[in-house]
């Protein structure tokens, strides 16, 4: 028998079946770098509508983690799809380069090297370390396939940027937003510095929960106020606290003016407790019987004092609205040094205080002999012992509760009153204006808007000063005695900032008061605090690089994309600064993505060992797999990743790659400049496929525009698996392989595949840039850009005429019918009736509507089902053993094995072959090899 393989148009391509992404991607990266791909894109898009994506700067510290990777990938997907949509996109990668993470790394190095250095030398080491981390992280981000202006990245430590940050701060001073005060702020005793709201995270903590008593001093006053007599029996106020270490700083005892309080008697004791709290408190104290003596409102007592249980002091009883009775006794001790509520309550009552601890969290030496230089958390046992020795401890137990922790050290923090600089959130109606601007922004997901509003409503004034070395300074002079600003502060700062722009932040620290102020140095001193890094990052929007290119945007970025934690962080700081200085929002849209968790929805942790490192995924599976996982996951929720997940995603990738490969392989020897078929001459199925691709493209572009990337993947997978894989590509194999090379039948098919492929490669480009770049090089034709990233969405796809009989609705019905036929064929295979569908002689028993639709295909119907013979009969003629469709009511199938001979060329079973020395193939194959060629109209 003759080998007919050479007479077939078999698929052929060098585009490999396996991606081998981890090996190929570095070569593709080099090609992009050699061609300066970002500059090429920028150059081509000059004059187009601009799109700005502002980059929330990560810390220049350590290797990137999976959260970093997700964030950069999401941003890159946006930039790439916006470029395909005809925008001139701007993306400048940014880094936070100052702050504690860098300081701690340098401090460890210094300690290890056992050397002493000056603060100036320390800053140099911090700068060098930060730069090295930027260099490393930049390579890691680029390895993800992220495009951006890497050569002009925004580093907060660049001299011009340091100057701009200081300049932005001085505008806040100028407009009256900044003030100095001595009040409690979040304080980390390990950082030895104040913390911003965004630097605090909450964890469950096991604490000592104690109930103690404070004896009324001169309790005759109480008896006179309540009972109008001068009875003198001892009375104790019962107080509950979970921070025993704050008791040495107690300056008052607070009751709520609106609560009812009971004076109760137990044996020989008289206690005052809130009425609601009595049963629970008595139960904890192990007291089963007590007598209610009197009930009174908190506001009905005044001018009372209590004796501190272990300090030789008396402190006043005050009224405060912040006192609650959900937990505890409805009475709290008040330490203004260690809490905002306590601070304001004491301030309202003109109660002054002095510090009891130092910046390291150690008690000062004048508080109590037992507490000298003791760490506050280690002092708890000592305090409880002092209470016990003084018969003041009524109950002690352990309690698990939510407690603030330092996000860097993962250790408990405190509120500590220190002299700090603050931004007044209520000045010039700033808080309400921020709320107004939030409502003008498009928030994705929508619930994040209310979250931001709630945070703005409840947030305190912003503490912007830090007691550290490596950071942008607060470049001002204050009076040595009064603390007031130098009268020429704004003018002086301009000169200082100009110096910083030339020489960096060290320029400020090199300045002496005498050299800069002359004789006034005796009256004024320079501030040595540095600015909160969140203020630094929040100032990016007002930086020079954005001022130059965003003039037509009024310095409003089109989009911010960051993790959930940035509501308190960068989203917040950017908003406050922009609202205060520019009277507008800094962003038009804000996307919040969730945190990464493992397959069990647990937060990733090195100690648990459930982390997934981007480098491991990239080195084994490739960046495109990580990008595909990112896009396929609903980022508005927690994003679960595991090895099992990545295996599943790899299956997605194979489906996408194999679809592209099939299309490409069947474009062998196809030249679009010469071989494209005019739409009016095309086979109807091919026109349907192009129309289907157009419908999918519209859905994909809409999903990109709505930032629903997981929907893009859903549409891609359905298109590859259903529309192409089990329908179109299966049906056209016979026509593509067996018809004549240059026939209308084949060129029509190739035209469809070419148009679909050139659209398809662009659909995947934002998500799979490495694969799309590789694929683009294999797509035939010279009338295209060198890189797919320079292209726009396809405009060559066209639709079927909805007025035609064989419109999309018609083909949708055929898709449903073919699905049911495939089930019947599979049933026949399982029952050993046939091995392959071409062995089938199929009879369909259908209603009149389906019969009419199928008969439109005439003799080509068998190609729809990939069988050798199809007959159509009335549904009522169906035998009892016919295969019944579960989806279509009036649809049954009988499948028998086709009697006949298998054509060695097309593999169809035919009843008769003209067999002589010249012909051993079917009539159709004779037409396609030595005849004029087979004619097709529908399939």
UniProtKB/Swiss-Prot annotation:
- Binding of Zn(2+) occurs at 903, 906, 922, 925
Where in this protein would one find the motif 'HIGH' region, according to its record? 58-68
Against Pfam families, the record matches this protein to: Anticodon_1, tRNA-synt_1, zf-FPG_IleRS
Cross-referenced InterPro entries? aa-tRNA-synth_I_CS (IPR001412), aa-tRNA-synth_Ia (IPR002300), Anticodon_Ile_BEm (IPR033708), Ile-tRNA-ligase (IPR002301), Ile-tRNA-ligase_type1 (IPR023585), Ile-tRNA_ligase (IPR050081), M/V/L/I-tRNA-synth_anticd-bd (IPR013155), Rossmann-like_a/b/a_fold (IPR014729)
Highest taxon of the lineage: Bacteria
The UniProt keyword set, sorted, is:
Aminoacyl-tRNA synthetase, ATP-binding, Cytoplasm, Ligase, Metal-binding, Nucleotide-binding, Protein biosynthesis, Zinc
Recall the GO molecular function terms of this protein's record. aminoacyl-tRNA deacylase activity; ATP binding; isoleucine-tRNA ligase activity; tRNA binding; zinc ion binding
Sequence motif: 'KMSKS' region, positions: 603-607
CC annotations in GO:
cytosol
What are the subcellular locations of this protein?
Cytoplasm
Q: Which reaction does it catalyse?
A: tRNA(Ile) + L-isoleucine + ATP = L-isoleucyl-tRNA(Ile) + AMP + diphosphate
Main subcellular location of this protein, as a coarse class? cytoplasm
Q: Which cofactor does it need?
A: Zn(2+)
Q: Which GO terms describe its biological process?
A: isoleucyl-tRNA aminoacylation
Sequence positions that bind ATP: 606
| SUBUNIT field | Monomer.
What NCBIfam families does the record point to?
Answer: ileS
- Functional description taken from the UniProt entry: Catalyzes the attachment of isoleucine to tRNA(Ile). As IleRS can inadvertently accommodate and process structurally similar amino acids such as valine, to avoid such errors it has two additional distinct tRNA(Ile)-dependent editing activities. One activity is designated as 'pretransfer' editing and involves the hydrolysis of activated Val-AMP. The other activity is designated 'posttransfer' editing and involves deacylation of mischarged Val-tRNA(Ile).
Please report the name of this protein according to its UniProt entry: Isoleucine--tRNA ligase
Species name: Buchnera aphidicola subsp. Baizongia pistaciae (strain Bp)
Q: What is the taxonomic lineage of the source species?
A: Bacteria, Pseudomonadati, Pseudomonadota, Gammaproteobacteria, Enterobacterales
